[in-house]
């Protein structure tokens, strides 16, 4: 049952057009490495795409799977969480993350959002690439309707094309706005994953401070503040400070 989920997924055709032939070939090559159990090679190629700015739930899922196969639990959790930021409720990401969470030493009691919030997040949680592609499609339709409006002489059809063009123009602004919101959402980091096997959470942002509790690798903590070298975090309503080198933002 578990192996069914920890498999790479393919990108849909529309998305391959958006990200370019070179990235598409790299993605497929990474998938081939994964299928032949060359997990370190697949991870390197997925990371190359990620570092070049590619954002998609497929990439985050496959990257998380590669790290999981390499026994790097914190990194796997990090990318599953990144994927769920742009695709809330995705079954593969959710299943794999839940399984990884059963392997953690620290159990977190993060409250789940209510249904209406989940529905809103599901709608707004499309990737920036998805909304950018949608904007291009809507812009093309708008231009086409404007051309029809310009060349048509019949009053009835002229009105139809005018109102249709107006509606698609409004829709264009909406998709552009959602693309910006989605990009901001991906960049926003309110939580982080612990990457050290054992991390001391200090009372104050100082190594000479006393330890209030400890966290282990893979734990997800809420970031409530920061200074130059430390994050203030909250875990199960317990606050404290950890050094930035031990925590990576989602």
Language model segments and positions:
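Boundary regions of SH3-family modules and the immediately adjacent low-complexity/disordered segments
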Residues: 159-196, 203-206, 210, 222-224, ...
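Membrane-embedded alpha-helical segments of integral membrane proteins
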Residues: 111-151
